[in-house]
Swiss-Prot record:
Listed Pfam families: Response_reg, Trans_reg_C
Entry-linked SMART domains: REC, Trans_reg_C
Entry protein name: Transcriptional regulatory protein PcoR
Lineage, uppermost ranks: Bacteria, Pseudomonadati, Pseudomonadota, Gammaproteobacteria, Enterobacterales
Residue intervals of the Response regulatory domain: 3-117
PTM-bearing positions, type 4-aspartylphosphate: D52
The entry's DNA-binding region: 125-223
């Protein structure tokens, strides 16, 4: 089930959106202020974000700026009463994918949501995002918290393997076979050294940590709750 985040401070509008999207078959979470909305969005667990501009604590402009600067590429639909052209242009230039004016027709909103989700799915095969890290499989680029990370060829292949099997514990023998095309030798620490070097680049200076050791089993890439 696809997950949609709604950040809307008007309670009636927020509940209406949430209920309507749930009835359309989506999982919809609602937050009524910018601070909590950004916190939820930063976890990278949503397929689409519906965002108001005028919000308590942090406004919509600040939220989308923070998300895009940290590498988040989830589609964002602004839903707002700010209807002048200058505001529309500002939203799109900050990285929004669509902009819908209040009052709105719910059927039009759903159509726009479906279009954005289809577009995102077509890009998903080449771009993977977990937490604040984005990996472009075509360009072979890695960005975490807005910072470009330089990897060697083998480090990139190792990261791509872990990404493609997020949440799955990969034994050293499998990593050895798929990344180095060789049988695993228990007397060598090649795999451990490679993982340690990869961790130093994508985990040491960032939170949350993404690569974890499962003692006696192998390695896994996942977001773990504190």
């Amino acid at each position: 089930m696809q997950r949609i985040l709604i950040v809307e401070d008007e309670q009636k509008t927020g509940r209406y959106l949430q209920q309507g999207l749930v009835e359309e078959g989506y999982q919809a979470d609602l937050f009524n202020n910018g601070r909590d909305g950004l916190g939820a969005a930063s976890k990278g667990q949503y397929d689409l974000i519906i965002l108001d501009v005028m919000l308590p604590f942090l406004d919509g402009w600040q939220i989308i700026s923070a998300l895009r600067e940290s590498g988040h590429e989830e589609p964002v639909l602004f839903l707002t009463a700010k209807d002048n052209v200058r505001d529309k242009v500002k939203g799109l230039e900050l990285g929004a994918d669509d902009y819908l004016i209040k009052p709105f027709d719910f059927t039009e909103l759903v159509a726009r949501v479906r279009t954005l989700l289809r577009r995102a799915r077509s890009q998903a095969a080449t771009v993977c995002t977990i937490a604040d890290m984005t990996v472009d499989m075509v360009r072979r680029t890695v960005i975490r918290s807005g910072k470009k990370i330089h990897l060697t060829g083998k480090e990139y292949v190792l990261l791509e393997l872990l990404l493609q099997r997020t949440g799955e514990v990969l034994p050293r023998s499998l990593i050895s076979s798929l990344v180095w095309n060789m049988n695993f030798d228990s007397d060598t620490n090649v795999i451990d050294v490679a993982v340690r070097r990869l961790r130093s680049k994508i985990d040491d200076d960032f939170e949350p940590k993404l690569i974890h050791t499962v003692r006696g089993a192998g390695y896994v890439l996942e977001i773990r709750e504190e």
